[in-house]
Structures are given as structure tokens and as C-alpha cells.
A protein has these predicted regions:
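Internal helix-turn-beta structural module
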Residues: 324-411
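Glycine-rich oxoanion-binding loops at beta->alpha junctions
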Residues: 70-112, 154, 158-159
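Glycine/threonine-rich beta-strand-loop-alpha-helix active-site module
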Residues: 68, 72, 79-83, 128-182
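Accessory alpha-helical/coil subdomains and C-terminal extensions
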Residues: 159, 177-180, 202-283, 287, ...
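An N-terminal, well-structured beta->alpha segment
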Residues: 1-42, 50-51
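A glycine/threonine-rich phosphate-anchoring loop and its flanking beta-alpha core
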Residues: 153-219
């Protein structure tokens, strides 16, 4: 392993994540804001605790009561006047349903002078859920969508049809109270109705689009689900004000600034990366082949969210697959490294945020008798990168603004 490049990568990751934490953005939005009636806080998503904590520090006892729903292991400590739930992700579980029911009961009976402060971040689609079908049916269709390689927009289009709170329905439940929504975006282009399936946003997707997804992936759905697929979601909401605070664009900008501090010339490739993870890794490696002898320190940056088609039974995530896929292409390059992370600190069903590879990675695996292509076929990037000390482990970061992949070329 190139320890110098790995240290630079770790430092860039640490500083960039700190730059996109939601705390200050939430406080800035709430500063000097006046409220007439009750203030009810609802925070949902992987960054929910962090956002709720910031709101509590800003508003204090002006918050009457609140609920946080976040992923297991993401609640750091109690927050006064706010009940914290941890629940399942990426597949909702009984705690998801229990916590969401508690939210529905809390916002019922509010009047037009009251405000629901709705703090939303990625992961909310699984965490904030009251299904119109059984929990088993919901888990089954979610697993089908994840396994077939459906992207997040397609997954959320289906989820909206099957939920009491998605696709603008939560905002309807809050009426006549006003909903002040602060959103941390984890979807490319920041489409409000797709972030966490848009609980407080008028829905732009249609039943026709949902049916197209069912047919595209040949999903196996029950007769009850088929009936729900024909019920439209709210197309207009008059009680919602929304602010977007944080996105993958800001994450890429933070990475760019940090690369510059280490003397690397940043090259922004895209903040809309959406392809197979293996293809992204191979693409970054191809850039390295072209520029590795330029004599310049270069950093190629790509933000977005890639896709993995699950064909094996291994352990890993899309960012780990990007790093491992790049390893073969940069084999033997002493001045090249690729790292890729999920900004929330979680990549797939693992404890890693992502992965790192450099010119030594492929050789180390070969010496251990491991074929990178077979590993990728089995979706087992985690265990391969563990052998090369290529796992990036940050723990829950408190933010969630997509992923970022970086190719470093030193001089």
C-alpha cells in the first residue's frame, strides 16, 4: 500500500465530511424565525439525530415535542423533549412502522397556527413508513427492487404507492398545520419528491411510471399491491415551505478544496454519476492510464450514486466495488490511488464507508491467490479490501449527501 496516498485520502475524506455536516445549515435556516403556535419536530433519515440536535440547540424549549427516526447506531445521546427511535435500513422493520405511527399520532389534531418542523435526510424511505400492505409484503418488494439493480428513483416511485406517508401524504396528515421542511439531499439533481420518497412534497411521479418499473424488472406483486398501484398521490400541497441544505454538489466542492490544499489540481468530472459501480471504477482507472506520467498532481472527482447488480453472495457495497474495480486497471502504478465513500459512513450492509485501492492492491490480492474478477462477480469486495487494508471505516458521520469517488495521481 502507498501509505502516503492513503493518508492523503483519509485526510481529504475527514475534512470533506465535516464540511457537509448539517448542523450549521439547520441553525442558519432557523435563526430568528418566529413561530406562532406549537412547534412539533419530526426528524427522519440517517442524519436525523444530527439535524434534530442542531434544531434543539437553536430553538430550545420553543420545541414542544418531537420524534427522531434514524438508523440503528446513529443516536448518540438523548435530546431534551425529543423521543429517539432507531429502525431498519435499507429494508423497513417493525421499529420503522412503530416510530412512524407515533409521528402520525403526534401531528394529529394540530391547528393552522402550529408548525411541524420536518428535518429530512436520505434513508427516510425505509425509516419513515406506514405501509398500506403487510410488513412482510413491503420487505419482499423492497428486497426485489434492491436485488434487481433498480435505482433510487425507481425504488421510491414504487414505495410511494404503498405508503400512508410517502409522496406528499405526510404533509396532508399534518393539515391544517404548516410544515417547515429542511432537506439534506441524497439524490442527484435534488428532486424534492424523491428524497426519502417525498413525505412533504407534491409528487411528480405517476401510476403509469410505477407500472413501467414493475414490468421492467418483472416484479412479483400481489393483487392488493396491484390495486394500490392505481391510486394517485397528492399533486399539490399548500401547507409546506421547503429549504434544501446540503447536496452532493457541496460534497464534491469540499473534496475539491481539500485536494487543492495537498497540492493536487482538482478536476471535477461530474456530480451526477449514475452507472454500474464496476464501470465507474474501470473508468477512473482508464483516466489514470492516460495521465499517470503527466508529472502533475491531479485529483479527478466524481459525485453521485452508482448501482450494483447483486449476482453473488458476498459482502460489500457500491463504493467498495468502485475501488476494487479500479485496482486491476491501476495495477503497478506507484503514483495512483482510487477511493470512494458514502457520505453517511455506510456502504451497503457493512461497517465500511467505502474502499481504497492503489497500484499495489491487485498484486497483493494475486499473491494471496485471489482473482479480482471472481470477487466482483460474487459481490465480495469487502473481504478482498479487508485483506489489503483498503476498507475505509468512518462510523456514522451525521450527514448523507450521496457518494464521492476520487482518483489521485501524484507527481
Amino acid at each position: 500500500m502507498n501509505k502516503e496516498l492513503r493518508a492523503v485520502a483519509d485526510n481529504i475524506i475527514d475534512a470533506a465530511i465535516k464540511a457537509v455536516l448539517p448542523d450549521e445549515a439547520v441553525k442558519k435556516t432557523l435563526k430568528d424565525r418566529k413561530f406562532d403556535g406549537k412547534v412539533i419536530l419530526v426528524a427522519v433519515g440517517k442524519a436525523a439525530w444530527q439535524m434534530a440536535k442542531a434544531a434543539s440547540e437553536c430553538l430550545g424549549d420553543r420545541i414542544n415535542e418531537g420524534i427522531v427516526i434514524t438508523k440503528y447506531g446513529h443516536v448518540k445521546e438523548p435530546i431534551e423533549r425529543i423521543e429517539c427511535f432507531e429502525a431498519g435500513h435499507p429494508v423497513p422493520d417493525e421499529n420503522s412502522f412503530k416510530a412512524t405511527q407515533a409521528v402520525i399520532e403526534m401531528v394529529s389534531g394540530l391547528n393552522k397556527n402550529d408548525t411541524v418542523l420536518f428535518l429530512l435526510s436520505g434513508g427516510g424511505s425505509a425509516l419513515f413508513e406506514k405501509p398500506k400492505i403487510t410488513g412482510e409484503e413491503l420487505q419482499d418488494i423492497t428486497n426485489q427492487l434492491l436485488a434487481c439493480g433498480a435505482d433510487i428513483v425507481e425504488i421510491n416511485t414504487i414505495r410511494k404507492r404503498l405508503s400512508e406517508v410517502k409522496g406528499g401524504r405526510f404533509a396532508k396528515l399534518c393539515e391544517p398545520a404548516h410544515v417547515l421542511s429542511i432537506v439534506l439531499s441524497d439524490i442527484l439533481g435534488d428532486p424534492l419528491d424523491m428524497i426519502a420518497s417525498g413525505p412533504a412534497c407534491a409528487d411528480t411521479t405517476t401510476c403509469e411510471e410505477a407500472w413501467h418499473i414493475v414490468e421492467k424488472y418483472n416484479l412479483n406483486i400481489s393483487e392488493d399491491i396491484k390495486k394500490l398501484m392505481d391510486i394517485e398521490t397528492p399533486k399539490k400541497l399548500d401547507n409546506v415551505t421547503t429549504f434544501i441544505n446540503g447536496s452532493v454538489r457541496e460534497l464534491c466542492s469540499a473534496v475539491s478544496r481539500e485536494c487543492s490544499k495537498y497540492g493536487y489540481e482538482p478536476v471535477m468530472l461530474t456530480d451526477q454519476l449514475c452507472c454500474q459501480a464496476k464501470e465507474a471504477g474501470s473508468f477512473l482507472a482508464s483516466i489514470a492510464k492516460t495521465h499517470c506520467k503527466s508529472g502533475k498532481k491531479l485529483a479527478y472527482i466524481a459525485g453521485g450514486e452508482t448501482i450494483v447488480n447483486i449476482t453473488g453472495h458476498g459482502k460489500g457495497g457500491r463504493n467498495q466495488e468502485i475501488a476494487l474495480s479500479a485496482a486491476e486497471g491501476i495495477k503497478g502504478m506507484s503514483n495512483a490511488a482510487v477511493f470512494s465513500i458514502g457520505s453517511d459512513g455506510t456502504d451497503g450492509p457493512t461497517d465500511a464507508a467505502g474502499g481504497y485501492s492503489d497500484g499495489d492492491t491487485a498484486g497483493v490480492l494475486k499473491n494471496k491467490g485471489i482473482d479480482i474478477f471472481e470477487v466482483l462477480k460474487n459481490n465480495d469486495a469487502y473481504n478482498a479490501l479487508k485483506l489489503t487494508e483498503g476498507l475505509i471505516i468512518t462510523g456514522p458521520t451525521g450527514t448523507n449527501v450521496n457518494d464521492v469517488s476520487v482518483l489521485l495521481i501524484s507527481d
